[in-house]
Amino acid sequence: MVQGTTSDAGKSTLVAALCRVFANRGLNVAPFKPQNMALNSAVTDDGGEIGRAQALQAIAAKVAPETDFNPILLKPNSDTGAQVIIHGKAMSNMEAGAYHDYKKVAMDAVLTSHNRLAKRFDLLLVEGAGSPAEINLRANDIANMGYAEAVDCPVIIIADIDKGGVFAHLVGTLALLSESEQARVKGFVINRFRGDISLLQSGLDWLEQYTGKPVLGVLPYLHDLALDAEDAIAIDNTLTNASVNIAVLLVPHISNHTDFDALRLHPNININYVAHTQAIPDVDLTILPGSKNVLSDLAFLKNEGWDTQIKRHLRYGGKVLGICGGMQMLGNSINDPLGVESSLQQMPGLALSDFTSTLTAQKILSNVTATMQLNNQQILCSGYEIHAGISQGEALNKPFLSFNEHPNGFTADGFISDDNAIAGTYLHGLFDQASATLQILKWLKADTVINPVNINQHREQQLERLAAMCETHLNIAHIIKIYEGHNHERTK
């Protein structure tokens, strides 16, 4: 199990890297994260929902994503509450205090998934959450040492040296663990080091002597590493000579921002993430992204004055695309009579298209293939749906996508406006296909000659790059000994 001294220490990336290392060596390996909190999620083949990081780790392990890889997923929908997803299915919305009391039930789900996977795979590579040393969260912990103790799992702790204070982070984390938990820690990994490693050696020697734990590797800072991000959005990517300029509205509960990864990777496409207090710049396309709390984010959008700016953008020839919750915002109204996402029950939309949306208790989760209707062309594309809502209205008679087959029986999705300036879809992952991306770019500018990035090929290159780094800078032989020695002790 990989645990971290802090959030964003490198746990997800290290687990993905090790998944690829051991998969390349012929092991039947799977990722596992007992509990994840994230707004970026993925849909499994059986119609379940897991964290995006575990889907990436599954790709690294060369296996299909499945719900057991992430039995508990928490999707925040307010500052104090989240939707609780167990074994891929949404159970309910809970405030933090209520979920704390629910953890014993959640642990049963975690152990059920663990036991099923342990029977099928040679090796489970487990990712912790946050830090194991959060004193206020240690009671009934299911994400870090609580899980490790329950299943008797050895632990490696990773820390990010680029943030500073790496020795204090590692020693302090270890000191706050119980004796049995300290014994479970088999070594450290230092992440994102840049500079002369010889200047770090005295610190590494001291750390090993002081703690009695080996340093299993010092991973270098990998520049331009681009993999599916779970939480953070890299917004500093402004290009001065881009052929196409796109604005993405950074609403507070933005979800599945990995939709835009393929666009961000292209050297001739400029993505402007428009944040609080910022105006929408002069761009070719404004995107309203997915949201985990659509009504709240719609209110935020209006308070920012973006509704007026979007209409001005359209008057001056710009185009607008709404994805999932962003599409719902483009209609006449959004209704949430059951309080699926918030206490707000109804709000007028931007009224840029003639339809209404109603949030429902049943969440639609599916991987689909569709035909995109754009530029008088029919383009085959694929993606995934994650939404708790149904849209109805006149505008949907001119759909953006059509389905030959859909798990829920739908024949079409979204809309394209009569003036060809506004489009909406529930489909995530649209830009992951180069052919679909090219048609959307041609929708913006008919003379577009950009060759879009193949995101799947790029992802594979990055995973192999990570694996090669670990083979060089990690003591893989020692990690294998930890695993084999632990298994030997358990079978005595």
Curated annotation (Swiss-Prot):
- Active-site residues, Swiss-Prot/TrEMBL: C324, H428
Q: Which Gene Ontology terms describe the biological processes this protein takes part in?
A: cobalamin biosynthetic process
Query: Does the record bear Transport in its keywords?
Result: no
- What is the documented function of this protein? Catalyzes amidations at positions B, D, E, and G on adenosylcobyrinic A,C-diamide. NH(2) groups are provided by glutamine, and one molecule of ATP is hydrogenolyzed for each amidation.
The entry assigns this protein to a family as follows: Belongs to the CobB/CobQ family. CobQ subfamily.
**Residues in GATase cobBQ-type domain copies:** 243-436
* GO molecular function (one): catalytic activity
Name the CDD domains for this protein.
Answer: CobQ_N, GATase1_CobQ
Q: What is this protein called?
A: Cobyric acid synthase
Which InterPro entries does the record associate with it? Class_I_gatase-like (IPR029062), CobQ/CobB/MinD/ParA_Nub-bd_dom (IPR002586), CobQ_GATase1 (IPR033949), CobQ_N (IPR047045), CobQ_synth (IPR004459), GATase_3 (IPR011698), P-loop_NTPase (IPR027417)
Pathway terms, separated by semicolons: Cofactor biosynthesis; adenosylcobalamin biosynthesis
Q: Which UniProt keywords apply?
A: Cobalamin biosynthesis, Glutamine amidotransferase
